[in-house]
From Swiss-Prot:
Main location: virion
Spans annotated as Esterase domain 1: 7-127
Role summary: Structural protein that makes short spikes at the surface of the virus. Contains receptor binding and receptor-destroying activities. Mediates de-O-acetylation of N-acetyl-4-O-acetylneuraminic acid, which is probably the receptor determinant recognized by the virus on the surface of erythrocytes and susceptible cells. This receptor-destroying activity is important for virus release as it probably helps preventing self-aggregation and ensures the efficient spread of the progeny virus from cell to cell.
Catalytic activity: N-acetyl-9-O-acetylneuraminate + H2O = N-acetylneuraminate + acetate + H(+); N-acetyl-4-O-acetylneuraminate + H2O = N-acetylneuraminate + acetate + H(+)
Signal peptide positions on this chain: 1-16
The organism of origin for this protein: Bovine coronavirus (strain LSU-94LSS-051)
Annotated Gene Ontology cellular component terms: host cell plasma membrane; membrane; viral envelope; virion membrane
Protein name: Hemagglutinin-esterase
Virion surface compartment residues: 17-392
GO molecular function: host cell surface receptor binding; sialate 4-O-acetylesterase activity; sialate 9-O-acetylesterase activity; sialate O-acetylesterase activity
Transmembrane annotation, as ranges: 393-413
Gene name per UniProt: HE
Region Receptor binding, residue ranges: 128-266
Active site residues according to the UniProt entry: S40 (nucleophile), D326 (charge relay system), H329 (charge relay system)
Intravirion side: 414-424
Amino acid sequence: MFLLPRFVLVSCIIGSLGFDNPPTNVVSHLNGDWFLFGDSRSDCNHVVTTNPRNYSYMDLNPALCDSGKISSKAGNSIFRSFHFTDFYNYTGEGQQIIFYEGVNFTPYHAFKCTTSGSNDIWMQNKGLFYTQLYKNMAVYRSLTFVNVPYVYNGSAQSTALCKSGSLVLNNPAYIAREANFGDYYYKVEADFYLSGCDEYIVPLCIFNGKFLSNTKYYDDSQYYFNKDTGVIYGLNSTETITTGFDFNCHYLVLPSGNYLAISNELLLTVPTKAICLNKRKDFTPVQVVDSRWNNAMQSDNMTAVACQPPYCYFRNSTTNYVGVYDINHGDAGFTSILSGLLYDSPCFSQQGVFRYDNVSSVWPLYPYGRCPTAADINTPDVPICVYDPLPIILLGILLGVAVIIIVVLLLYFMVDNGTRLHDA
């Protein structure tokens, strides 16, 4: 029993001599069941096409290029592919999901639907989209895109109403006004179908303001009706502003089924693409690496806003992004963050990744995995080790009981042996 305090004391001395096990600013994984979604900074195929071939273009270690655990596309992002004609079919599956993308839709692109629109609304949309994506990928293994087929019984076609620069919105699709309608005060519908996935992320969007057309102002109104369950999802314009508004989107998580898209005023919108979520898993927080430009170009913090514990851990560099290939590709700080993908780690937390699961100087917040259960609390001069007392108390009780049993047995056999000798 006297060995236990000495063991604790020795452990404290070892800790004071240098073992610290702090959380590290990396993304990593518990085992080989992981997947990364990214852009040019992790697009090995894009590197192959550069002339000369130059891996300094990436923040990803090239040793991971043949891992089969990466879905990345130069110049793209999941949000960009979700809404616009500039499309890449991000596809991947894993227990532990990592995202390092988003920079290819920022204030630098200054997207807005109309000349009097607002890029701020689109940054808000981006934040809402990634919030939904991160939350759901904490409970789903598989992500991919699927097309959403729809049937509209009118003669009008979809129109590219919402576009800016090289970006053209095609999800949701706008159905143009029928030729026999003199204005936009009409009701119109279209059927769409979701099948083949466990759940889907789909957009439901409206112009939240007074939309002007030919001297008339319109209030947008859009609904999705699940014909199988009777559930209806809807948005109505509530703002009275006439300028500075844009396309406000909500991102719904819907089950498979037959749906009806309904517009009571202005143009009908209907989803054409969806994030396909498959294979439910035990809750596993996703990891997100900040995706931003060099300070010479304007970035946003929407992935940071979207990534909140307990479903998401956010990792960022403390310095400006300065690449070695060019200012926006090959930054040492972000390369260091991604270097954690080269090895397994036992514990993840809001503060970072722990390399060991025994003791640490920092109590992990929102821990996941096999995490340290003890911490070194350092006063200015004296290191004090603080352990979870319950295991120590229980161990002490068990040792005490064992000693008592041993003593009782020894006394029993000594008395019994003495009796036998006396009888002889």
